[in-house]
Amino acid sequence: MKPVEKMFSEKGSWFKGNLHSHTVNSDGRLTPAQSAAYYREHGYSFICFSEHDYYTDLRKILDRDDFIILPGLEASTYLITSDDFSGLFEPEVLQRGYCDMTFQELMAFRNKNVNFTLKKAHHIHGILGTKEMRAAAGENVFTVNQLYPIRIYLNQWDGVNAAQTLSDSLKQKGCFTTYNHPIWSRVDIEDVRDLQGVWAIECYNYDTVNECAEGEDTVFWDTMLRHGTDISCFASDDNHNGGTF
């Protein structure tokens, strides 16, 4: 029997990190300091606190020589459907077909109005990029503790255009982008296949594996590559601190 080849070279420097996690700054259960301590204790070298639609930069507080924080956020756009949106939105919004909300406004809307269905979602990371990326963003670069608006599409959308618009807007703020958990988000391959300029797709999401057995997204990555889309992949735990580490 041929021995299994090693997946990684023994040469060079290798670091373990997590690009997708949440704390009490969105819907996680631990503080950033508690979460950072847990990851350090388990041999990680870096983490991105990717709060929902809320950019944070905790480098000055939590960075260490052996553990670094990647500033970022998990930004969202949604397609919602209803037989009748009249009375829920202003006429100009209904005519335009979309509106922007903060995360808090969306939650209040959801709790108040039950006559709609959340049909699809795009969750895209913006992770603060290189000096060159930040310089190109100029005054648009993200500031600390910044809420990011959520675009809500009513009854229909051009899926790939919605995702491209969100990714491009994050890049204009000095970030590189990733596309997260497409199966959990209920998107079709046509909604993401032609995305351009996205660094990587999340091909494995451990949290959604545990939640609903829908965290293995390699079919999306493979289809995008077959179609000629230039995109890498990554795996994450999407930790919300809900159980034993």
Predicted feature residues:
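Substrate-binding cleft/loops of secretory-pathway carbohydrate-active enzymes
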Residues: 186-199, 241-245
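A metal-dependent hydrolase metal-coordination microenvironment
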Residues: 2-176, 180, 187, 194, ...
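Short acidic/histidine-rich active-site segments
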Residues: 229-245
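N-terminal acidic, glycine/proline-rich low-complexity segments
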Residues: 223-226
